[in-house]
Each structure stands twice: as C-alpha cells, then as structure tokens.
C-alpha cells in the first residue's frame, strides 16, 4: 500500500528564494494586501511570485466557511476595508501586471456576499491599468440574490468559480456549499454576459471515483464553462481532509484528453495545476483558442 504521508516526486517543488519573489512579497506586505498564495499555502508560490504573478485575496483574511480542504482561516470575518480596491489597483500598477487574478474568502455575512466589492476592485483597476486583463475567482454567493448580476455587469475578462470536488463529497469536504448552486452560478454568468470567459476547477485525490469526475466534467460543459482545471489535492495540515490518493501524471493526461473531447476551449490537468497557475499565459491561449473556434 502506498505511503500517503510521503508526497511522490512529481509533487515536489523548489523552495522560493529569488530576488523577484522577495520583491513581490515586500510590495504585497507594504500595501497590506492578502494573497491566496500565502493563505492557502499554494505549492506554486515560488514560481509565480518570481514572475510577479500573484492572486490577491480581497474581503479580508477570515472565511465564514470551513471547507475541509482549505487552509484559509475561518471564524468571525474582518470588517470590510473601503480602501482595499484602491490599494489593489496600486499594486497592479506597481507590479505592472498584464493579467491579475482576484479571489476572496466567503462572506456569508454580507448582503451580496461581497459581489459589489469585487465590482469596485474591477472598476479601480480599469481606471489605473486599463490594459490589464482581470480574472476573478469568486465564492458561490449562495442565497445572495442579485450577486451574479453585479458580477456580470462589472465585466471581468474571466469569471472563475470552482466546484472543487464531486457532489458525493460535498457534505464532508465542502459542507457549506451546494454543487448545483455552483453550476447554476457559472451558467448564469455566461447567460448574463456571454463575452465573459468562464472557468471552473476541481481537485482529485479526495476519494472520488473516476466516473464521478467524468460526470463533473460533463456538468461543467453543460453549464457552458470555457476553461477547466483539474489538480491534485494536497493536505495543508493534519487538521484537514487526508489525501486518499496521489493521482499519477498519466492519469491527469487521460483526464485532460477526455475533457478536451467535450468541447472546452481549454483544459489544464496536472498534479500542480491550480486555478490561478499560469493564469496570464492561459488567458492568452484562451483568447487564441476562441478566435480559432470562430473561424473554424
């Protein structure tokens, strides 16, 4: 039986130590911004920050949910910071980002789940960095009427919301969420603003069956999702859900090939694939694939 306490060689990454990494770290600290890279203990932080790529986390650093896979703090959330959109726009400008990814904690305590704060962040970035493309990775806005409309009207270039896992594992892995609500949110954004690219992702290695993964792939395509990401679940701490399996690179290649036959504009599936990993390069490919589809 495989030792799941020891990560296989294909999971290992180099420790961050580049000058660019520390410059990015200092700028984020000085502007008092949170990043999901740090809060969620992302394995790709060294590579991304060395390239000045970062995923900023808005709406505070404390989440109102307690998902079993996530390393972000849970509890009573922070007060909303009205100056955060301006600081975020300043960071985007100083880092000279061509593409920025904005995510957030869940804010079930807010009337719109934080949708209007996302919209304000988009607006501020557009003012100071009009050529920067904007990708947002949002919570599910469960029971937040009108949130999807606020997001769609803000016109991000990419709307990302992750289904995270298969429906049968929601009760144990993502207890505060509803699978079909997530699908509905993705579909609604596409219906409200067809020009917005939609994106969703899931983790594998939590105990799901292959037929369940295939069903999620089909469900996401039916919801008109353009871009699918699939990555290996890694246990952040001993208090989180255990890894049930380390999916091999060959198995990821199979899932990627399968998903590509379903009609997605883009699919990324590998052990270290994460929602925001290589997001800037992937956005360019996404646009190219869309243009090719139009002329084919």
UniProtKB/Swiss-Prot annotation:
Q: Which GO terms describe its molecular function?
A: 4 iron, 4 sulfur cluster binding; lipoate synthase activity; metal ion binding
Which EC number applies? 2.8.1.8
Give the originating organism.
Answer: Rickettsia rickettsii (strain Sheila Smith)
User: Domain of life of the organism in this record?
Assistant: Bacteria
Span of domain Radical SAM core: 49-265
Q: What is the lineage of its organism?
A: Bacteria, Pseudomonadati, Pseudomonadota, Alphaproteobacteria, Rickettsiales
Protein's recorded name: Lipoyl synthase
Paste the cofactor note. Binds 2 [4Fe-4S] clusters per subunit. One cluster is coordinated with 3 cysteines and an exchangeable S-adenosyl-L-methionine.
Q: Which UniProt keywords apply?
A: 4Fe-4S, Cytoplasm, Iron, Iron-sulfur, Metal-binding, S-adenosyl-L-methionine, Transferase
Q: Which cofactor does it need?
A: [4Fe-4S] cluster
- Tell me what reaction this enzyme catalyses: [[Fe-S] cluster scaffold protein carrying a second [4Fe-4S](2+) cluster] + N(6)-octanoyl-L-lysyl-[protein] + 2 oxidized [2Fe-2S]-[ferredoxin] + 2 S-adenosyl-L-methionine + 4 H(+) = [[Fe-S] cluster scaffold protein] + N(6)-[(R)-dihydrolipoyl]-L-lysyl-[protein] + 4 Fe(3+) + 2 hydrogen sulfide + 2 5'-deoxyadenosine + 2 L-methionine + 2 reduced [2Fe-2S]-[ferredoxin]
Positions annotated to bind [4Fe-4S] cluster 1: 37, 42, 48, 276
The similarity annotation says: Belongs to the radical SAM superfamily. Lipoyl synthase family.
- State if Cell division is listed as a keyword: no
Q: Name one Pfam family in it.
A: LIAS_N
Question: What residues bind [4Fe-4S] cluster 2, as annotated?
Answer: 63, 67, 70
Q: What is its main location?
A: cytoplasm
**What is any one of the record's Gene Ontology cellular component terms?**
cytoplasm
Q: Per its UniProt record, what InterPro entries does this chain match?
A: Aldolase_TIM, Elp3/MiaA/NifB-like_rSAM, LIAS_N, Lipoyl_synth, rSAM
* Catalytic class of the enzyme: transferase
Per its UniProt record, what SMART domains does this chain match? Elp3
The metabolic or biological pathway listed in the UniProt record of this protein is: Protein modification; protein lipoylation via endogenous pathway; protein N(6)-(lipoyl)lysine from octanoyl-[acyl-carrier-protein]: step 2/2
**Subcellular localization:** Cytoplasm
